[in-house]
Curated annotation (Swiss-Prot):
Sequence similarity: Belongs to the TRAFAC class translation factor GTPase superfamily. Classic translation factor GTPase family. PrfC subfamily.
CDD domains from the UniProt entry: RF3, RF3_II, RF3_III
Name of the coding gene: prfC
Domain of life: Bacteria
Domain tr-type G: 8-277
Protein name: Peptide chain release factor 3
Native species: Aliivibrio fischeri (strain ATCC 700601 / ES114)
GO annotation terms (biological process): regulation of translational termination
Length: 526
């Protein structure tokens, strides 16, 4: 297969949803249809050994939540799909935000009983920055749900995207009989109890087929015909151009747990979602089909293999081809490195990558030299833009149970901050270590990982910090004055960037009024 064909068949997407909308379940069913796994292990059975394939860190297995972003690659129809599973739990938004910078499209999973929820809104804001195309899956139709039309209206008004239904539900809850596939003009019937494997489904051609009335009942069949007449009048038809511009989303209905409707959604996604896209670097736009290799690191994951204390840097290939043993320019350090042991992923199962193409995600072994946002190229000096760090919203002081382990604690915290699990701040005026996170669960993860990976027992104490801002100033003299007068509020983060630690929002506002030339930033590019 030629290089252009290889790049053209790739589809790299992430799944976004509110916690508990069924994201991990849908990930599993997608893998089932991609023949990447033989049987789905439902996540709810937290006590059983059949844990979901994409939740593989100890803490995730214990709690039944996806904490880290896994990458899974599998073939479907004529495409090669790279699926990035993002943490669905309330607290892991920062990792999720960054993952969204590495994909070309997204699948949005909505719980049809609840509609658009808070976390989905936040994630959609990030996809908006790059007009990422979105495919929507309305989940949990085998339970009692809201009126589908009402949920579509909510998506349109709250997320600013037109909805084009591709399938439409026939009943819901105990009365859920299947979906009518608008593009195929056929009804696909649902049978419960087949969540773990792929079943042959029964279909009925045409909406006016008397067989439909005989199968689902005349009343339900008639009300579906009426609903569809309304839907066809009220909703736009699918338009590929608008979809690629992020202005319209195709909508599928089904139940991930019942393994129904996922395959139609996957067909739509592989047919319509874009192949690897052109990316903006600070210097120029980089086209996926260029010969020369380039890629950027969007995530670092520590100790994916408990048997080896290693760290893996996840790199999205933007252009060209990776071949085993090739030489790359690590742009930030200016060093040429030879990469012979990059890996590809199937959640937790790693295999050595011999070749990989634009759109693929590969893992580089990292011994502390690679950071989030780093660019690798075949010589050219490029820096890809738009890989954000977000100012934390929660802070704790971290303290050792054994004061002699200060060195291990610092090493562990710096490594965890480099991979984006948490942010660390060292005040200039004392020896405190302040940990900042976007959500509470991150604090638990840090303590658990410090103990498991660095043999350090740490505890938290409260600290009077409301927020943090990265500071810089074009005028050196004014910056010196600012530093002199604000020593007590200044700290260095894990990457030695100067940060203003504000005890209250009022304090932050006053500081920015007093020093108008100093910029206080809530996000920082890696």
């Amino acid at each position: 297969m030629s290089f252009l064909q290889e790049v053209g068949k790739r589809r790299t997407f992430a799944i976004i949803s509110h916690p508990d909308a069924g994201k991990t379940t849908i990930t599993e069913k997608v893998l089932l249809f991609g023949n990447a796994i033989q049987k789905a292990g439902t996540v709810k059975g937290r006590g059983s050994n059949q844990h979901a394939k994409s939740d593989w860190m100890e803490m995730e297995k214990e709690r039944g939540i996806s904490v880290t972003t896994s990458v899974m690659q599998f073939p479907f129809n004529d495409c090669l799909v790279n699926l990035l599973d993002t943490p669905g739990h309330e607290d892991f938004s920062e990792d999720t935000y960054r993952t969204l910078t590495a994909v070309d499209s997204c699948l949005m999973v909505i719980d049809a009983a609840k509609g658009v929820e808070d976390r989905t809104r936040k994630l959609m804001e990030v996809t908006r920055l790059r007009d990422t195309p979105i495919v929507t899956f309305m989940n949990k139709l085998d339970r009692e749900v809201r009126d589908p039309m009402e949920v579509l209206d909510e998506v349109e008004s709250e997320l600013g995207m037109a909805c084009a239904p591709i399938s439409w539900p026939i009943g819901c809850g105990k009365e859920f009989k299947g979906v009518y596939h608008i593009h195929r003009d056929e009804t696909i019937l649902y049978e419960s109890g087949h969540g773990h494997e792929i079943q042959e489904v029964r279909t009925i051609k045409g909406l006016d087929n008397p067989e439909l009335d005989a199968t689902v009942g005349a009343d339900l069949a008639e009300s579906v015909r009426e609903e569809l007449e309304l839907v066809m009048g009220a909703c736009p038809e699918f338009d590929h151009e608008l979809f690629l511009a992020g202005e319209l989303t195709p909508v599928y209905f089904g139940t991930a747990l019942g393994n129904f409707g996922v395959d139609h959604m996957l067909e739509g996604l592989t047919d319509w979602a874009p192949a690897p896209q052109t990316r903006q670097a600070n210097e120029r736009d980089v086209v996926a089909t260029e010969d020369k290799f380039s890629g950027f690191v969007f995530k670092i994951q520590a100790n994916m293999d408990p048997k080896h204390r290693d760290r893996i840097a996840f790199m999205r290939i933007v252009s060209g081809t990776y071949t085993q043993g090739m030489k790359m320019n690590h742009v930030r350090t200016g060093k040429n490195v030879s990469i012979s042991d990059a890996v590809t992923f199937m959640a937790g199962d790693r295999s050595r990558a011999e070749t990989a193409y634009a759109g693929d995600i590969i893992g580089l072994h990292n011994h502390g030299t690679i950071q989030i946002g780093d660019t690798f190229t075949q010589g050219e000096s490029l820096k890809f833009s738009g890989i954000p760090n977000f100012a934390p919203e929660l802070f704790r002081r971290i303290r050792l149970k054994d004061p002699l382990k200060q060195k291990q604690l610092l090493k562990g915290l710096v490594q965890l901050s480099e991979e984006g699990a948490v942010q660390v701040f060292r005040p200039l005026q004392n020896n405190d270590l302040i940990v900042g996170a976007v959500g509470v669960l991150q604090f638990d993860v840090v303590v658990a990982r410090l103990k498991a990976e660095y043999n350090v027992e740490a505890i938290y104490e409260g600290v009077s910090v409301a927020t943090a801002r990265w500071v810089d100033c074009a005028d050196g003299k004014k910056m010196d004055e600012f530093q002199r007068k604000n020593q007590a509020n200044l700290a260095l983060d894990g990457g030695d960037n100067l940060t203003y630690i504000a005890p209250t929002m009022v304090n932050l506002n006053l500081a920015s009024e007093r020093f108008p030339d100093v910029q206080f930033r809530a996000t920082r590019e890696h």
